């Protein structure tokens, strides 16, 4: 289905992308993975999406999310994209794809049978003059150190896509300012753009991972002071809430 939460951005939940590479208990879309069908977003056809964007000229961005749209076969994902591209919507400027594929299955664009087809879909977007932003989810610096992740990032960037990173702040996993500083620096080194530090929302079985907001702000402040301006594109600590994104400034 669709969610028009922000004036300029429509969230799109393709029905075939409502599972994920991982089942994180801190995920704020936990209901989608535990059998609560009435809370799932689903849509079988892409026509409604292109029609909606056409009828709402204020919309410039579409975020493909889930679940994870990158668990879909390239042919299925490409069909959604082609519906949008064929509609030639003048107000559509950016397509975003929220995914954990880089950290959990970089082979999606390396060795999967349809890896090149996936990359071709990315190229069709950028060749159309539409900005493509891969919203890559990483939880820790170590996820960025493997050769396969580095190769996948390179492949994606060669299509003209830009990779922006977003990460949740998690007790027992990454609640360390030095790690965050190193992770942002590594992301810049690999050609990615640090984008968000998230705090976990009050959904699902996330209580084990939650970090108090005061400490979250301290971690962010200490980390941001250790990096150059190129990594200070990151925003946080942030939370997606009913009014939109809420950021703690102090």
What are these regions (language model features)?
Residues 1-12:
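N-terminal [4Fe-4S]-dependent radical SAM core
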Residues 9, 30-62, 72, 76-79:
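Conserved alpha-helical substructure of the radical SAM core
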Residues 11-13, 63-66:
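Short glycine-rich or small-residue beta-strand-to-loop segments that form or flank ligand, phosphate
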Residues 13-31:
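Local cysteine-cluster metal-coordination motifs and their immediate loop/turn environment
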Residues 22-26, 35-39, 147-148:
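A short secondary-structure junction signal
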Residues 47-54, 70-209, 214-215, 219-227:
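Conserved AdoMet/S-adenosylmethionine-binding subsite of the radical SAM
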Residues 60-62, 92-95, 130-132, 233-237:
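Residue-level recognition of the N-termini of beta-strands and the immediately preceding loop/turn
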Residues 218-250:
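C-terminal accessory regions of radical SAM enzymes
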């Amino acid at each position: 289905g669709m969610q028009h939460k922000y004036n300029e951005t429509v969230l799109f939940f393709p029905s075939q992308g409502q599972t994920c590479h991982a089942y994180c208990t801190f995920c704020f879309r936990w209901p989608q993975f535990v059998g609560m069908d009435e809370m799932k977003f689903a849509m079988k056809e892409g026509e409604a999406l292109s029609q909606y964007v056409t009828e709402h000229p204020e919309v410039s961005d579409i975020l493909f999310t889930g679940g994870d749209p990158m668990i879909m076969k390239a042919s299925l994902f490409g069909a959604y994209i082609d519906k949008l591209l064929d509609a030639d919507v003048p107000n559509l400027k950016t397509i975003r794809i929220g995914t954990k594929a880089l950290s959990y299955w970089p082979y999606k664009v390396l060795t999967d049978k349809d890896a090149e087809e996936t990359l071709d879909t990315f190229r069709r977007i950028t060749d159309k003059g539409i900005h493509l932003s891969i919203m890559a989810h990483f939880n820790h610096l170590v996820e960025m150190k493997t050769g396969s992740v580095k190769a996948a990032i390179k492949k994606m960037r060669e299509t003209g896509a830009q990779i922006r990173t977003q990460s949740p702040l998690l007790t027992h996993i990454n609640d360390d300012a030095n790690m965050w500083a190193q992770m942002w620096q590594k992301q810049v080194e690999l050609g990615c753009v640090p984008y968000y530090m998230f705090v976990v929302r009050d959904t699902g079985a996330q209580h084990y991972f939650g970090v108090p907001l005061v400490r979250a702000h301290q971690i962010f402040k200490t980390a941001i002071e250790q990096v150059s301006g190129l990594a200070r594109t990151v925003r946080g600590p942030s939370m997606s809430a009913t009014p939109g994104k809420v950021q703690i400034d102090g």
